[in-house]
Amino acid sequence: MSGKRVCPVCGSTEFIYDPSRGEIVCKVCGYVIEENVVDEGPEWRAFDPGQREKRARVGAPESILLHDKGLSTDIGIDRSLTGLMREKMYRLRKWQSRLRVSDAAERNLAFALSELDRLASNLSLPKHVEEEAARLYREAVRKGLIRGRSIEAVIAACVYAACRLLKVPRTLDEIADVSRVDKKEIGRSFRFIARHLNLTPKKLFVKPTDYVNKFADELGLSEKVRRRAIEILEEAYQRGLTSGKSPAGLVAAALYIASLMEGEKRTQREVAEVARVTEVTVRNRYKELVEKLNLKVPIA
Protein backbone atom coordinates (compact mmCIF):
# COMPACT_ATOMS: atom_id res chain seq x y z
CA MET A 1 0.00 0.00 0.00
CA SER A 2 1.49 3.41 -0.95
CA GLY A 3 0.29 6.94 -0.21
CA LYS A 4 1.31 10.53 0.50
CA ARG A 5 2.12 9.96 4.15
CA VAL A 6 5.77 9.65 5.21
CA CYS A 7 7.24 7.27 7.80
CA PRO A 8 8.45 9.41 10.73
CA VAL A 9 11.29 6.94 11.42
CA CYS A 10 12.94 6.31 8.04
CA GLY A 11 11.16 8.72 5.69
CA SER A 12 9.81 5.97 3.42
CA THR A 13 6.53 6.50 1.58
CA GLU A 14 5.87 2.80 0.98
CA PHE A 15 3.48 1.01 3.33
CA ILE A 16 1.72 -2.32 3.64
CA TYR A 17 -1.62 -3.15 5.24
CA ASP A 18 -1.84 -6.08 7.69
CA PRO A 19 -5.54 -7.14 7.68
CA SER A 20 -5.12 -9.64 10.53
CA ARG A 21 -3.96 -6.87 12.90
CA GLY A 22 -5.71 -3.92 11.29
CA GLU A 23 -2.40 -2.03 10.98
CA ILE A 24 -0.63 0.04 8.33
CA VAL A 25 3.11 -0.67 8.55
CA CYS A 26 6.17 0.93 6.96
CA LYS A 27 7.50 -1.44 4.31
CA VAL A 28 11.12 -0.46 4.98
CA CYS A 29 11.53 -0.32 8.77
CA GLY A 30 8.33 -1.98 10.04
CA TYR A 31 7.14 1.03 12.04
CA VAL A 32 3.37 0.92 12.69
CA ILE A 33 1.95 4.04 11.05
CA GLU A 34 -1.71 3.47 11.97
CA GLU A 35 -3.57 0.99 14.20
CA ASN A 36 -7.15 -0.31 14.39
CA VAL A 37 -7.82 0.29 10.70
CA VAL A 38 -11.24 -1.02 9.67
CA ASP A 39 -11.23 -3.13 6.51
CA GLU A 40 -14.42 -2.22 4.66
CA GLY A 41 -13.94 -4.91 2.04
CA PRO A 42 -15.80 -8.24 1.93
CA GLU A 43 -15.19 -10.84 4.67
CA TRP A 44 -14.54 -13.52 2.02
CA ARG A 45 -11.68 -14.07 -0.44
CA ALA A 46 -12.03 -14.96 -4.11
CA PHE A 47 -9.31 -16.45 -6.30
CA ASP A 48 -10.91 -15.92 -9.71
CA PRO A 49 -13.62 -13.69 -11.27
CA GLY A 50 -16.20 -16.50 -11.24
CA GLN A 51 -15.72 -17.11 -7.54
CA ARG A 52 -15.92 -13.39 -6.83
CA GLU A 53 -19.21 -13.09 -8.73
CA LYS A 54 -20.62 -16.12 -6.91
CA ARG A 55 -19.68 -14.84 -3.45
CA ALA A 56 -20.47 -11.16 -3.93
CA ARG A 57 -23.74 -9.95 -2.46
CA VAL A 58 -25.59 -6.87 -1.34
CA GLY A 59 -27.12 -6.79 2.13
CA ALA A 60 -27.11 -9.38 4.86
CA PRO A 61 -26.42 -13.07 4.15
CA GLU A 62 -29.30 -15.50 3.73
CA SER A 63 -30.53 -17.15 6.90
CA ILE A 64 -32.40 -20.45 6.98
CA LEU A 65 -33.77 -19.35 10.37
CA LEU A 66 -35.96 -16.65 8.80
CA HIS A 67 -39.09 -17.65 6.89
CA ASP A 68 -38.09 -15.48 3.91
CA LYS A 69 -34.39 -16.31 4.46
CA GLY A 70 -33.78 -12.63 5.20
CA LEU A 71 -34.19 -11.59 1.57
CA SER A 72 -36.98 -9.07 2.13
CA THR A 73 -36.55 -5.37 2.88
CA ASP A 74 -38.05 -3.66 5.89
CA ILE A 75 -39.55 -0.19 5.84
CA GLY A 76 -37.47 1.73 8.34
CA ILE A 77 -38.54 3.80 11.33
CA ASP A 78 -37.87 7.53 11.38
CA ARG A 79 -38.63 8.93 14.81
CA SER A 80 -38.35 12.48 13.53
CA LEU A 81 -41.60 12.08 11.56
CA THR A 82 -44.69 13.65 13.05
CA GLY A 83 -48.44 13.54 12.67
CA LEU A 84 -49.92 12.20 9.44
CA MET A 85 -46.60 11.05 8.00
CA ARG A 86 -45.86 8.90 11.05
CA GLU A 87 -49.34 7.30 10.81
CA LYS A 88 -48.80 6.67 7.12
CA MET A 89 -45.46 4.96 7.71
CA TYR A 90 -46.99 2.86 10.51
CA ARG A 91 -49.74 1.65 8.13
CA LEU A 92 -47.16 0.85 5.43
CA ARG A 93 -45.08 -1.21 7.86
CA LYS A 94 -48.21 -3.03 9.01
CA TRP A 95 -49.23 -3.90 5.44
CA GLN A 96 -45.69 -4.93 4.57
CA SER A 97 -45.65 -7.29 7.54
CA ARG A 98 -48.94 -8.83 6.40
CA LEU A 99 -47.82 -9.19 2.78
CA ARG A 100 -44.58 -10.94 3.78
CA VAL A 101 -46.63 -13.76 5.28
CA SER A 102 -49.57 -13.42 2.92
CA ASP A 103 -50.49 -17.10 2.55
CA ALA A 104 -51.08 -19.91 5.03
CA ALA A 105 -47.84 -21.71 4.17
CA GLU A 106 -45.75 -18.60 4.85
CA ARG A 107 -47.60 -17.90 8.10
CA ASN A 108 -47.10 -21.48 9.26
CA LEU A 109 -43.40 -21.36 8.41
CA ALA A 110 -42.97 -18.04 10.23
CA PHE A 111 -44.74 -19.49 13.28
CA ALA A 112 -42.65 -22.69 13.19
CA LEU A 113 -39.37 -20.79 13.01
CA SER A 114 -40.38 -18.48 15.86
CA GLU A 115 -41.18 -21.60 17.92
CA LEU A 116 -37.79 -23.03 16.94
CA ASP A 117 -36.10 -19.85 18.14
CA ARG A 118 -37.92 -20.13 21.48
CA LEU A 119 -36.95 -23.80 21.95
CA ALA A 120 -33.33 -23.20 20.96
CA SER A 121 -33.08 -20.32 23.42
CA ASN A 122 -34.59 -22.31 26.30
CA LEU A 123 -32.36 -25.31 25.56
CA SER A 124 -29.21 -23.16 25.06
CA LEU A 125 -28.58 -24.78 21.69
CA PRO A 126 -25.68 -23.65 19.49
CA LYS A 127 -26.64 -21.93 16.24
CA HIS A 128 -25.56 -24.81 13.98
CA VAL A 129 -28.05 -27.11 15.74
CA GLU A 130 -30.84 -24.55 15.35
CA GLU A 131 -29.99 -24.22 11.65
CA GLU A 132 -30.04 -28.00 11.18
CA ALA A 133 -33.47 -28.18 12.85
CA ALA A 134 -34.71 -25.43 10.49
CA ARG A 135 -33.33 -27.35 7.50
CA LEU A 136 -35.09 -30.54 8.61
CA TYR A 137 -38.37 -28.70 9.12
CA ARG A 138 -38.20 -27.05 5.67
CA GLU A 139 -37.49 -30.47 4.13
CA ALA A 140 -40.48 -31.94 5.99
CA VAL A 141 -42.69 -29.12 4.65
CA ARG A 142 -41.38 -29.67 1.11
CA LYS A 143 -42.27 -33.37 1.32
CA GLY A 144 -45.73 -32.68 2.72
CA LEU A 145 -45.02 -34.34 6.08
CA ILE A 146 -46.60 -31.61 8.20
CA ARG A 147 -50.21 -32.11 7.12
CA GLY A 148 -52.40 -33.30 9.97
CA ARG A 149 -49.66 -32.79 12.54
CA SER A 150 -49.08 -30.14 15.16
CA ILE A 151 -46.47 -27.59 14.06
CA GLU A 152 -45.14 -27.44 17.63
CA ALA A 153 -44.72 -31.24 17.74
CA VAL A 154 -42.92 -31.38 14.38
CA ILE A 155 -40.57 -28.49 15.16
CA ALA A 156 -39.75 -30.06 18.56
CA ALA A 157 -39.11 -33.38 16.78
CA CYS A 158 -36.77 -31.60 14.34
CA VAL A 159 -34.89 -30.07 17.27
CA TYR A 160 -34.48 -33.51 18.84
CA ALA A 161 -33.32 -34.99 15.52
CA ALA A 162 -30.83 -32.15 14.98
CA CYS A 163 -29.39 -32.66 18.47
CA ARG A 164 -28.89 -36.36 17.77
CA LEU A 165 -27.47 -35.84 14.28
CA LEU A 166 -24.94 -33.29 15.55
CA LYS A 167 -24.20 -35.16 18.81
CA VAL A 168 -25.36 -32.35 21.09
CA PRO A 169 -26.76 -34.14 24.16
CA ARG A 170 -30.37 -33.17 24.86
CA THR A 171 -32.90 -35.74 26.01
CA LEU A 172 -36.45 -36.01 24.73
CA ASP A 173 -37.62 -35.12 28.24
CA GLU A 174 -35.65 -31.86 28.18
CA ILE A 175 -37.19 -30.89 24.85
CA ALA A 176 -40.70 -31.84 26.02
CA ASP A 177 -40.22 -29.67 29.12
CA VAL A 178 -39.83 -26.50 27.07
CA SER A 179 -42.23 -27.49 24.28
CA ARG A 180 -45.97 -26.79 24.24
CA VAL A 181 -46.77 -30.42 23.42
CA ASP A 182 -46.21 -33.60 25.40
CA LYS A 183 -43.38 -36.10 25.08
CA LYS A 184 -45.49 -38.80 23.39
CA GLU A 185 -46.60 -36.49 20.59
CA ILE A 186 -43.04 -35.29 20.01
CA GLY A 187 -41.83 -38.90 19.98
CA ARG A 188 -44.45 -39.90 17.40
CA SER A 189 -43.55 -36.95 15.18
CA PHE A 190 -39.83 -37.71 15.57
CA ARG A 191 -40.25 -41.32 14.44
CA PHE A 192 -42.43 -40.23 11.49
CA ILE A 193 -40.00 -37.51 10.39
CA ALA A 194 -36.96 -39.78 10.83
CA ARG A 195 -38.55 -42.48 8.68
CA HIS A 196 -39.51 -40.14 5.82
CA LEU A 197 -36.33 -38.03 5.84
CA ASN A 198 -34.09 -41.11 5.84
CA LEU A 199 -32.64 -40.35 9.26
CA THR A 200 -31.34 -43.84 9.91
CA PRO A 201 -30.55 -45.20 13.39
CA LYS A 202 -26.86 -45.04 12.44
CA LYS A 203 -27.11 -41.30 11.68
CA LEU A 204 -29.12 -40.64 14.83
CA PHE A 205 -26.99 -42.80 17.11
CA VAL A 206 -25.80 -40.96 20.20
CA LYS A 207 -23.06 -42.60 22.24
CA PRO A 208 -23.93 -42.76 25.94
CA THR A 209 -20.53 -41.18 26.63
CA ASP A 210 -21.77 -37.98 24.95
CA TYR A 211 -24.02 -37.44 27.98
CA VAL A 212 -21.42 -38.06 30.68
CA ASN A 213 -20.10 -34.51 31.07
CA LYS A 214 -23.57 -32.99 30.94
CA PHE A 215 -24.92 -35.17 33.77
CA ALA A 216 -21.66 -35.10 35.75
CA ASP A 217 -21.67 -31.29 35.73
CA GLU A 218 -25.14 -31.25 37.25
CA LEU A 219 -24.11 -33.81 39.87
CA GLY A 220 -20.88 -31.99 40.71
CA LEU A 221 -18.72 -35.05 40.03
CA SER A 222 -14.96 -34.96 39.53
CA GLU A 223 -12.96 -35.73 36.40
CA LYS A 224 -11.89 -39.02 38.00
CA VAL A 225 -15.52 -40.17 38.26
CA ARG A 226 -16.23 -39.09 34.67
CA ARG A 227 -13.28 -41.09 33.34
CA ARG A 228 -14.38 -44.15 35.29
CA ALA A 229 -17.96 -43.82 33.97
CA ILE A 230 -16.68 -43.53 30.39
CA GLU A 231 -14.55 -46.66 30.86
CA ILE A 232 -17.62 -48.55 32.09
CA LEU A 233 -19.74 -47.34 29.16
CA GLU A 234 -17.07 -48.12 26.56
CA GLU A 235 -16.69 -51.66 27.88
CA ALA A 236 -20.48 -52.06 27.92
CA TYR A 237 -20.61 -50.89 24.28
CA GLN A 238 -17.88 -53.32 23.21
CA ARG A 239 -19.79 -56.18 24.82
CA GLY A 240 -23.06 -55.21 23.13
CA LEU A 241 -24.83 -54.19 26.35
CA THR A 242 -25.94 -50.76 25.11
CA SER A 243 -28.02 -51.86 22.11
CA GLY A 244 -31.67 -50.87 22.46
CA LYS A 245 -31.08 -49.17 25.81
CA SER A 246 -31.78 -45.52 26.64
CA PRO A 247 -28.45 -43.61 26.63
CA ALA A 248 -29.65 -41.49 29.57
CA GLY A 249 -30.42 -44.57 31.68
CA LEU A 250 -27.04 -46.16 30.91
CA VAL A 251 -25.13 -42.99 31.72
CA ALA A 252 -27.06 -42.54 34.96
CA ALA A 253 -26.17 -46.08 36.05
CA ALA A 254 -22.52 -45.73 34.98
CA LEU A 255 -22.15 -42.45 36.90
CA TYR A 256 -23.84 -43.99 39.93
CA ILE A 257 -21.40 -46.92 39.86
CA ALA A 258 -18.39 -44.66 39.24
CA SER A 259 -19.39 -42.34 42.10
CA LEU A 260 -19.44 -45.33 44.47
CA MET A 261 -16.13 -46.70 43.18
CA GLU A 262 -14.37 -43.33 43.49
CA GLY A 263 -15.82 -42.40 46.88
CA GLU A 264 -18.05 -39.58 45.62
CA LYS A 265 -21.35 -41.30 46.30
CA ARG A 266 -24.53 -39.95 44.73
CA THR A 267 -27.89 -41.61 45.38
CA GLN A 268 -29.92 -43.40 42.71
CA ARG A 269 -32.57 -40.73 43.13
CA GLU A 270 -30.08 -37.92 42.48
CA VAL A 271 -28.72 -39.43 39.27
CA ALA A 272 -32.23 -40.42 38.12
CA GLU A 273 -33.45 -36.83 38.52
CA VAL A 274 -30.52 -35.41 36.56
CA ALA A 275 -30.86 -37.99 33.77
CA ARG A 276 -34.66 -37.63 33.71
CA VAL A 277 -35.21 -41.37 34.12
CA THR A 278 -36.86 -43.39 36.89
CA GLU A 279 -34.99 -44.87 39.84
CA VAL A 280 -36.15 -48.28 38.60
CA THR A 281 -34.30 -47.67 35.31
CA VAL A 282 -31.12 -46.71 37.16
CA ARG A 283 -31.44 -49.77 39.38
CA ASN A 284 -31.99 -52.15 36.44
CA ARG A 285 -29.09 -50.73 34.38
CA TYR A 286 -26.90 -50.79 37.51
CA LYS A 287 -27.55 -54.51 38.07
CA GLU A 288 -26.91 -55.34 34.40
CA LEU A 289 -23.62 -53.44 34.25
CA VAL A 290 -22.31 -54.79 37.55
CA GLU A 291 -23.18 -58.40 36.69
CA LYS A 292 -22.20 -58.45 33.01
CA LEU A 293 -18.97 -56.47 33.48
CA ASN A 294 -18.11 -58.18 36.78
CA LEU A 295 -17.58 -54.83 38.51
CA LYS A 296 -16.46 -54.66 42.14
CA VAL A 297 -18.62 -51.93 43.63
CA PRO A 298 -18.56 -50.88 47.30
CA ILE A 299 -21.84 -51.51 49.10
CA ALA A 300 -23.98 -48.35 48.81
UniProtKB/Swiss-Prot annotation:
Domain of life: Archaea
Keywords: Metal-binding, Repeat, Transcription, Transcription regulation, Zinc, Zinc-finger
Annotated Zn(2+) binding sites: 7, 10, 26, 29
The keyword Transferase belongs to this UniProt entry's keyword annotation: no
GO MF entries: DNA-binding transcription factor activity; TBP-class protein binding; zinc ion binding
Classification via PANTHER family: TRANSCRIPTION INITIATION FACTOR IIB, TRANSCRIPTION INITIATION FACTOR IIB-RELATED
Protein name, as recorded: Transcription initiation factor IIB 1
Gene field: tfb1
